[in-house]
Amino acid sequence: VNIDLNQVFHLHNTVDAPITVVYKKMHHRDISDVNAILEIDETDHVTGQRLFDGTDADALYNMSTDIFIVDTPWLIEKLEAEIHKEHPEKLRYILRDLAVEHGAFAFEYTGYIANIHSVESYYRANLDMLETNKFMSLFSPNQKVYTKVKNEEPTYYAPGSQIKNSQFASGSIVEALVHDSIISRRVHLHQRAEIRSSLLFPGVVVHEGAVVEHAILDKGVVVETGVTVRGTKEAPLVIKKGAVITEDIG
């Protein structure tokens, strides 16, 4: 999520509630059982909450992002009261309860958000970045994301390489077919290798004729010549850091 909090601050200052919570309407497959689902009235105030139970698979749920705007003196007062309890709660749960108790203003976020709670959701969130509208929503020019800079040489694409709908970091050598994938730095993809719908971390080497499909290869993984590594869209295969794969998997 990449939200402009200035807008949330502005709306928070116009309502009488001491707490504002940001929520997003989400499909059931994008929510886990640790997420809070909000009950919101017609005036956009929170009236209740519950943990997600997935009882209605077709519904959109008001999932709390656990992003809160609160009045500072009010929050300090509530936290001081909490620490004197025999079993004080963690801050996340305190804020969730306060949102219901004090009728928090509910701010609906309509941009891109990925709720990562499993290998499959992590895999899907990364591949979402291959869709232009989702990429631009997360990395908006008006709401910059600053990352650690690595000044390396550009990735080299050999004449025989075939690239479709993929993203590449710098410093790699690509001689292979790469479709619908995200390739990190210093990766070497040899001739006649095929990479489809996969995430390759830094330093991965895929040798000649190998096939990687619906997989997540951690740092330094080596896939030997002619080997197939294949998961599925629903259950991507994860190869641990530094592994050398000499036999077919999947």
Predicted regions and their residues:
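Left-handed beta-helix
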Residues: P73, A81-G250
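Unchanged
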Residues: V1-L127, I239-K240
